[in-house]
């Protein structure tokens, strides 16, 4: 299949050809925990983002739009499924993303995009604290 097919059908997906990824095979992934903690990182597996005591309730991939200050979350984790936003009361986001609008894109043909920033109160945490 031509490369343009993937770019047009999967606009929010980052595809790397073999040996092109700057981090080996790590990808930009996130998980959501039942405590409302959004964990973000360049990892091989979503499970690498889980800290002791965490209970993941979904995950997926992310992209950062630096021009419009948006954190775009999309797709789903094979390990933890689609993020279950309805179980979260307050979202805790790494402080590096303060001021960013957060949006989750379902892209399944059934759900509308979920504007996380407008739907949940957001607190920020220092990523070094690991909580």
For every predicted segment, state its role.
Residues 1-131:
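Eukaryotic phosphoinositide-binding membrane-targeting regions
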